Curated annotation (Swiss-Prot):
Tissue: Expressed in trichomes, that are stiff epidermal hairs located on the surface of petioles and leaves.
Any one GO cellular component localisation term in the record: extracellular region
Function: Plant defense neurotoxin that causes pain and systemic symptoms in mammals via modulation of voltage-gated sodium channels (Nav). Potent modulator of human Nav1.5/SCN5A (EC(50)=55 nM), Nav1.6/SCN8A (EC(50)=0.86 nM), and Nav1.7/SCN9A (EC(50)=208 nM), where it shifts the activation threshold to more negative potentials and delays fast inactivation. Also shifts the voltage-dependence of steady-state fast inactivation of Nav1.6/SCN8A, but not that of Nav1.5/SCN5A or Nav1.7/SCN9A. On Nav1.7/SCN9A, principally acts by binding to extracellular loops of domain IV (Nav site 3).
Listed name of the protein: Beta/delta-urticatoxin-Uf2a
Length: 143
């Protein structure tokens, strides 16, 4: 059953027009955990000088309970203003660009680039706004 879920998920990602040029890397880890990551290089270069890509899409599946545990779309600062700014539409149905740091996309497929303000919950996928830090890795507060 786990193999069927993985095949269906990979077919969905591979058939998406936004991901047609994406390189897929699949790694088998300890036990039944599978990590799949994809990246799309810039139009004019394959990656930035620091090796980061224009867009990163990560999936983490645990076939023990067959739940999608983590689905993340994140962006990095990009040269020439090629990232998506504050409160602008984002997600794989909207653009192949990621949000400018420290913003993240509020929804995987169609959201807005936002950051977590002071005093609000933050963590691994919910980044604090500039000049703020999260006091916990998974469950923290922006200070």
């Amino acid at each position: 059953m786990g193999a069927i879920v993985l095949v269906a998920l990979m077919a969905l990602v591979a058939s998406s027009s936004a991901f047609s040029d994406i390189e897929h890397n699949i790694m088998k880890l300890e036990g039944e955990n599978i990590i799949s990551s994809s990246s799309t290089p810039n139009d004019d270069q394959s990656s930035f000088s620091d090796g980061t890509s224009d867009m990163v899409e990560s999936l983490f599946l645990n076939s023990g309970n067959r739940n999608l545990v983590l689905m993340m779309l994140s962006g990095r600062p990009q040269p020439n203003g090629r990232c998506i700014g504050d409160a602008q539409p984002c997600g794989f149905l909207v653009s192949d660009k990621g949000c400018c740091d420290p913003n993240y996309c509020s929804e995987y497929s169609k959201g807005k680039c936002i950051c977590v303000p002071k005093g609000q919950p933050c963590g691994l996928l919910h980044f604090c706004c500039l000049d703020l830090t999260c006091d916990g890795y998974f469950n923290g507060t922006c200070k």
